[in-house]
Amino acid sequence: WRRSGDRDARKGPARAGAGDGGEAIFQAEFSHAGTLTVVSDRSGWWNLYQLRDRGAVPVCPRAEEFGGPQWVFGLSRDAFVSGGTMLCAHGVGGQSRLGRLDLQTGALEDLQLPYTSFDGLRVEGQRACFVGAGPVRPSAVVALDLGTNRCRELRLGSTLEFDPSHLVVPQAFEFESVDGRRSHAW
């Protein structure tokens, strides 16, 4: 529910902005400009929407997930950078990328990072922090310089050393299951 009016929602009548009629939403937050942004499953995919006077408007509609399983506590898959820009994790088949999204145009530029999992994403000034991991990289708390797109691993989840060439990189695939539905596996 939200109220039209100011950012603090103190003015105007309350109305449902998203999340009714079987729709699930999460990570509702206001942009720096005061626009409420949510991740919604209304399209069948977890996509980003902004709630405006004319209703929920898709920001970057794609057949990809910008959300994640709701049984994970503290889930944070996107964060506002400045102005009309945000960082967001997105992907399909369990492999995510981190991208810089222009909220006005919907243009999404993926950052070239060595991770395929991004959790706990936060932004402060010109630095983003997240827990990143990949098929041959253990989980790590990572600081990303938003000016240079360079990462620094602040703390590794494991200090075990191994030769990455001894690991098999999992490949995501889809197959048809019951009633013509698509299932995902590794």
Model-flagged regions — what are they?
Residues 1-186:
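Peripheral, non-catalytic segments that deliver or gate enzyme domains
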